[in-house]
Amino acid sequence: MENQDSLFETLNPPQRLLMGPGPINAYPRVHQAISQSLIGQYDPVMTGYMNQVQSLYRGVFATQNKQTFLVDGTARSGIEACLVSILKPGDKVLIPVIGRFGHLLCEIAQRVGAEIKTIDIEWGQVCPAERVEEEIKRFQPKLVATVQGDTSTTMNQPLKEIGEVCHRHGVLFYCDATASIAGNDLLVDEWHLDAVSAGLQKCLGGPSGSSPVTLSDRCAEVINRRKHVEAGIRAAHHEQGDDVMIQSNYFDLAMIMDYWGPERLNHHTEATSMLYAARECARIFLEEGATNVIARHKVAGDAMVAGLQAMGLTVFGDQSVRMNNVVGVYIPNEVNGDAVRGELLNRFGIEIGTSFGPLHGKIWRIGTMGYNARQECVLTTLAALEAILLKHGARVDAGQAVAAAMALYC
């Protein structure tokens, strides 16, 4: 039973350095943006901010897509909105599964009633475009859906070649870029991506609670064939789609496109503070410049790997296709992984991640993302981890990790 007195205490969460696979510490500017005054959803200032967010995220996604907007909710809300709006019961979807979050795409597609074909890849590897093309020819899907950066394995699925395959065969291409966006290259138009969803809480350096989404014209047309305007706001000039209604009201992207469109057709009340956060995340990314931000994430990730290897630890997976921003490292046999994580948190205030499924208890996942993709965060984490490992009797090479990581910053 919760202590009743604590219910009335002012929130005072401890200071943490969040070096796991997400969420991470938000940029200070994002905290400041969230604290700004609330205004009404149809206030001209608010609709102006919404227009700005659309323009800013076209820059983040490297796209000219008109339909670029936010879905209110965590990153999973954007994933679900895309899949339930594109797929109807009986539609065929091809899903390369490179980790835990590929299985999530399967789960959502199954709930829609889609016919699913998976390409199951060993965890720690990625799916070759040739495999995708082979299955497209055999299976003839409406949609290929994949995860770009799967934090469960730390792998970064190459998308350019798969996009070319999908474009060549006339298949829609969806990508969950939650963990990869802003820390790894993501070129929506150039790579022929038709639908992409993301989140703020990783390399974009914000809190969880808003999902940026972008849709190609072709994808938006497919979704709008299922358009339904609610009774009570429907007017004579509103046209209904001629296809099956989208099964979810809240995640109906046809409705959400109308809400973000010129008519501002009522659907939900925009999460004002999260819109402020999303706007600031995009401004920070574009001000620093995509090339610079991604390079910062790459050097931070490479420095973390260098430090871990200098300790004598082994990193997980194919390093040629690892995300810039998350590293998997095998837990030394002689230590209890959860005990090390717990002491790292309690003594140093540093959080690193465990893992899922077949990797649970075998690797830690260490993130260098957003505001935490900085030299001091990398060095502090390595020094603290080394100290705790030595205390727990791990056979590591002491005094090497920080110097190895620093060498990448010289």
Name each model-derived stretch:
Residues 1-44:
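N-terminal "arm"/small-domain region of PLP-dependent enzymes with the aminotransferase-like
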Residues 25-26, 201-306, 310, 410:
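Active-site C-terminal subdomain of aminotransferase-like
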Residues 33-81, 100, 104-108:
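Conserved N-terminal alpha-helix of the aminotransferase class I/II PLP-enzyme fold
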Residues 87-103:
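Conserved PLP-anchoring active-site segment centered on the Schiff-base-forming lysine
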Residues 126-182, 195, 203:
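Active-site phosphate-binding strand-loop segment of PLP-dependent enzymes
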Residues 189-201, 211:
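Conserved active-site segment immediately N-terminal to the catalytic lysine
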Residues 314-347:
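Conserved PLP-binding catalytic core of the aspartate aminotransferase-like
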Residues 358, 362-410:
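PLP-dependent enzyme catalytic core of the Aspartate aminotransferase-like
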